Amino acid sequence: MASLLWGGDAGAAESERLNSHFSNLSQPRKNLWGIKSTAVRNIDGSINNINEDDEEDVVDLAANSLLNKLIHQSLVESSHRVEVLQKDPSSPLYSVKTFEELRLKEELLKGIYAMGFNRPSKIQEMALPMMLAHPPQNLIAQSQSGTGKTAAFVLAMLSRVNALELFPQCLCLAPTYELALQTGRVVEQMGKFCVDVQVMYAIRGNRIPRGTDITKQIIIGTPGTVLDWCFKLKLIDLTKIRVFVLDEADVMIDTQGFSDHSIRIQRALPSECQMLLFSATFEDSVWHFAERIIPDPNVIKLRKEELTLNNIRQYYVLCEHRKDKYQALCNIYGSITIGQAIIFCQTRRNAKWLTVEMIQDGHQVSLLSGELTVEQRASIIQRFRDGKEKVLITTNVCARGIDVKQVTIVVNFDLPVKQGEEPDYETYLHRIGRTGRFGKKGLAFNMIEVDELPSLMKIQDHFNSSIKQLNAEDMDEIEKIDY
């Protein structure tokens, strides 16, 4: 497959800049150890002063989506059960266990194996027969990062392309240009043996003059730019599109204007165009959007994985102030055998202060918070997974999706609360759910002040689980903790 293509010299410069952007992923993180000041050094060497950042980190759906793509570079084992709803319940339901069963072109099969795929993932087993069917079938699918979702729809696009026809035939919408580039990388890898198939980006910075004859068969872009290319610049003839993919639908509808742009594009597509929509979550708003944009679909859902607290022992420690919390943490840390730990703080200020304290006491610690770029976060998480640091201190940017088998302890240095001091039950669940995974037992400690006790009791009642008080000054009591 030809390299990913841009328009003209400006496009080449943009491509070079983006190659540099992604090469940062392999750069090692600067060492945090030995810091003796009230500042924390970022991954890029810049300094954050702990007198700043009282605000809580706001979870950015698009950034989280990109982060999950970067940290799930290979397939992950999913505990979800796949549920299929066919548009025609009487038709046979096919699944595959090998890629050979799909009767793919030889160059596509070679591309799949070159990417390291040995057999289809759970969602690929069910989705690929539908996506590659003749005549084409529309699909709405729920899928998390690491399940092979992007590879599945890229395979569908590459399978439908006629390399001899030099015009756009497949169109993929992504909510951000970074996510579009990630999809493009998969196209390039899987299509490396499809020498006459090319891809082009409809994203900001790639300016194409009106009336340009685009000969690339696959277009990947963001809704606003694609809309301009189709209706304003007349670069893409939507009546010739054979496959339309809308990726990250839950992120798309969270971005103002994108859902309207996507619907306008979809309405100009021919009735025989295959339409595929993917989303990590299927809340009501996503469902309503999906039903508006994908006609007569098959549906693949992941039966909801219930995070359980049954194998997590929960404790709380009453503290008077921040330093008291830190002393309690040190006592626990010195009395219990810990694999790896994640400590959650509500604000960047507390996260940075705690990082400095632990580093000065000789602990191997990394700090993860919202001011870091997505690539920097991915690098820190990978180092933590590799065991290069034993403690990860973070804000809510790490409350979901980070699965590390060695994590045995989660600490809420600050209790998660919503505005108005109401307990944030969902965040609490996902925070302490970082331990006790993969069938193992785990521990969760909540460092609270007296006025937070009513909120903690609400959490206990909400989950109908036991949260026991722990005297962190009684080392014998701590040592008796069994998990």
Curated annotation (Swiss-Prot):
Induction entry: Up-regulated at transcriptional level by chorionic gonadotropin via cyclic AMP-induced androgen formation in the Leydig cell.
Chain ranges for the short sequence motif Q motif as given in the UniProt record: 97-125
EC number per UniProt: 3.6.4.13
InterPro entries, A to Z: DEAD/DEAH_box_helicase_dom, Helicase_ATP-bd, Helicase_C-like, P-loop_NTPase, RNA_helicase_DEAD_Q_motif
Alphabetical keyword list: ATP-binding, Cytoplasm, Developmental protein, Differentiation, Helicase, Hydrolase, mRNA transport, Nucleotide-binding, Nucleus, Phosphoprotein, RNA-binding, Spermatogenesis, Translation regulation, Transport
Tree of life domain: Eukaryota
Domain Helicase ATP-binding: 130-300
Catalyses which reaction(s): ATP + H2O = ADP + phosphate + H(+)
Motif stretch (Nuclear export signal): 61-74
Subcellular location: Cytoplasm; Nucleus
GO cellular component, one term: chromatoid body
Binding positions for ATP per the UniProt entry: S143, Q144, S145, G146, T147, G148, K149, T150
First-listed, main subcellular location of the protein, grouped into a coarse class: cytoplasm
Uppermost EC category: hydrolase
Residue span of motif Nuclear localization signal: 100-114
Expressing tissues: Highly expressed in the Leydig and germ cells of the testis and weakly expressed in the pituitary and hypothalamus.
Disulfide bonds: none
Function statement: ATP-dependent RNA helicase. Required for mRNA export and translation regulation during spermatid development.
Family, per entry: Belongs to the DEAD box helicase family.
Designated name of the protein: ATP-dependent RNA helicase DDX25
Species annotation: Homo sapiens
Gene transcribed to yield this protein: DDX25
